[in-house]
Structure formats: structure tokens, C-alpha cells
Regions:
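Hydrophobic alpha-helical segments at protein termini of multi-pass membrane proteins
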Residues: 1-239
């Protein structure tokens, strides 16, 4: 009887984890398949996913620290509280952690020799982050959460990764061309732009009672990200 119960529990948890992981893997494959010039090695991709998982742990600590500081400065019932929480604490903790691990694991890689590589690298880090976060959510809240996050949060992290990767690839290109000032600007944008999008995503999802505003936002976000992937892939070149 105990064995049957344990076996059922393990099978259920396996299904939950599969439901959490499969959407992220699917999106990784789609972005990877768009790498026309020189697809990255499995070793590089696995390093990026692990970096994304580690960035999730960094962000968790950062969010706890800075959200505690925020509550000391701004009352939780103040209208400004949620703005600062989502746009500053959560968004910059998560996107900043992703960027930190992205740069640490790929900036000096000899395989970083095409502009579209920046998109692949950033998306794999973002989805490593999302994969770990999703497993945690799904194990706590079940299949319904897996279904909702598979069409919202997982693609959302992918989109943030696309925007980060576009600027990251541009930064590498102009750095190789000797323009370090413009490279710095693109590196800053690689954090700021996805952080602002992330903050808007969380803020609209949490505070807006009209679901259609959120649906419209993610439709535009997904559409813009898809267009960027297609454009960057089509115009890819060695750098």
C-alpha cells in the first residue's frame, strides 16, 4: 500500500516537473533552430541553462533583501509601492541576475562570433531561469499553474531574453569594432529594456482587473519578440 502511494506520488511529481519543463525546452529549440550561420555547441547551451538556474537563486536573495528595504521606505498600501516593487525590485533583480550570469558565461566565449548568438545566449539563460522558477511554482500549485504559465510566464521570460539578447549581440559587435562607448550603451540597454518590460508585465498582471489589457500587452510583446528573432536571424552576420 505504501509502495503504491509512493509510486503514485513520484509519478505525479514527475508529470508536474515535465509540465514545467517542456514549454521552456520547446522555446529553446525554436530559438536555436533560427541560428542560421553557426549553431552553438551543446556544451555552451548547457552552460547557459545552468547559468540561468543560478541566476534564479541570485534573484531570489536580491528580491528578498530589497523588498524588505522597500517596505521600510514605502508603506505597502501606498500607490508607489507596487510600482517600485515590480519595476525596480523584481524586474532589476531578475533581469540583472540573468545579465550578470549571461555576461559571465558567454562574453569571452570563442563561440560568440555572430550577432544572433546574443539572442540565443540570452534566451537560454532566461529560460534556464524560467525553468527553475516554473518547477517551483508547479510543484506548489499544480497543473493549472503549469498550463497558465506555459502561455504567459514562460513565453514572457523568452521575450525578455530576446530583447536582452538583441542588445547584447549589438554590444559584442561594436566592441569588436573598437567602439567601447557604444558597447557600454548597448550593455546598459540589455538590462534596462527587458527590466522595464518585465516590470510592466508584472504590474499589469497584478493590478489590472481587466484581463484584456494584459492579453493585449502580452500579444504585442510576443509579436515584437517574434519579429526581432526573425529579423536578427535573417540579418545575422559574423562579428
Amino acid at each position: 500500500m505504501f509502495y503504491f502511494f509512493l509510486s503514485s506520488l513520484l509519478n505525479y511529481n514527475f508529470l508536474l516537473i515535465a509540465a514545467a519543463v517542456i514549454p521552456a525546452i520547446f522555446l529553446m529549440v525554436k530559438v536555436y533552430q533560427s541560428d542560421r550561420l553557426e549553431p552553438e555547441s551543446t556544451a555552451v547551451l548547457w552552460t547557459l541553462v545552468r547559468s540561468g538556474i543560478f541566476s534564479c537563486l541570485i534573484a531570489l536573495v536580491s528580491e528578498k533583501v530589497f523588498s524588505s528595504v522597500l517596505t521600510l521606505i514605502v508603506p505597502q498600501n501606498h500607490p508607489l509601492y507596487l510600482v517600485l516593487l515590480f519595476f525596480v525590485v523584481v524586474a532589476f533583480s531578475e533581469e540583472g541576475a540573468k545579465y550578470f550570469m549571461l555576461r559571465r558565461s558567454s562574453w569571452n566565449s570563442p563561440e560568440f562570433n555572430c550577432q544572433y548568438d546574443g539572442v540565443v545566449y540570452a534566451v537560454f539563460v532566461s529560460l534556464g531561469f524560467a525553468l527553475w522558477e516554473n518547477i517551483s511554482y508547479v510543484l506548489h500549485y499544480g497543473f493549472s499553474t503549469a498550463l497558465v504559465r506555459s502561455v504567459t510566464a514562460i513565453p514572457g521570460h523568452t521575450c525578455f531574453g530576446v530583447f536582452m539578447g538583441v542588445f547584447y549581440g549589438l554590444a559584442r559587435r561594436v566592441e569588436n569594432a573598437g567602439d567601447s562607448e557604444k558597447a557600454l550603451l548597448f550593455r546598459v540597454l540589455a538590462v534596462v529594456v527587458p527590466a522595464l518590460l518585465h516590470g510592466a508585465y508584472d504590474y499589469i498582471a497584478t493590478t489590472n482587473t481587466n484581463t484584456w489589457y494584459f492579453v493585449l500587452f502580452i500579444a504585442v510583446l510576443f509579436g515584437a519578440s517574434y519579429w526581432l528573432v526573425v529579423k536578427t536571424s535573417r540579418e545575422d552576420r559574423y562579428i
